[in-house]
Regions:
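Short, compositionally biased
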Residues: 2-107, 159, 178-190
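An exposed tryptophan-centered "aromatic clamp" motif
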Residues: 93-109, 114-176, 188-190
Length: 190
């Protein structure tokens, strides 16, 4: 009689006298490193109030605090495009205000510079971003891919500011009052 793989597993668990709680603990800790994090290619950003912290992986015990992904440049981008828990609408002014009220290691946030974003943008960052999003999705966390328009600190004219497109690596300018579904909240710390 052929045993199924599950029957074999049950037999082994019984032989080794492994309890259900030991098995559950082992199962839940697979793939984690000694810090209890599930490793990700790019660091993840966690938000508690107006304070941001960065960890080199997914901390399932802080899943509700998970805010975003840190790019190679150090710029932090929200998990998803659009408004939401960050800003009521994604105008330049509202995103700038949000950035300024957030802190990281005691420093206040600012809008990122288009030059900093451009310097690190490319296939390497995109591949790391995709791998990071994959880990998040495996753990039932919604995250958009390497896309979105990020408002930059540089102003073009009084009513216009630069934005950077993650999708194609270009920057352009737009009315500060414009919003779009592909706007992505992002901030930097100097």
């Amino acid at each position: 009689v052929m045993e199924t793989k599950f029957e074999k597993l049950e037999k082994l668990i019984s032989e080794l006298n492994i309890s259900e709680s030991e098995l559950a603990k082992w199962f839940n800790n697979r793939g984690k490193d000694k810090t209890g994090l599930i490793p990700t290619e790019l660091p993840l950003v966690y938000r508690r109030g107006n304070e941001l912290t960065v960890e080199n992986g997914l901390n399932l015990s802080r899943k509700s605090e998970l805010w975003g992904i840190q790019l190679l440049s150090g710029v932090m981008v929200a998990l998803t495009c659009g408004s939401g828990n960050n800003v009521s609408e994604t105008t330049w002014g509202k995103v700038k205000k949000f950035a300024e009220k957030m802190t990281f290691n005691g420093k206040p946030g600012v809008l990122p510079s288009k030059d900093v974003l451009k310097k690190h943008w490319g296939n390497k960052e995109e591949a790391k971003f995709a791998a990071t999003v994959e880990v998040l999705e495996e753990n039932e966390i919604e995250a958009d891919g390497y896309r979105g328009c990020i408002w930059c600190s540089e102003v073009y004219y009084p009513d216009y500011a630069y934005y950077f497109s993650l999708k194609n690596g270009i920057n352009d300018w737009n009315l500060k009052t414009d919003t779009g579904d592909d706007d992505r909240v992002a901030l930097a710390f100097s």
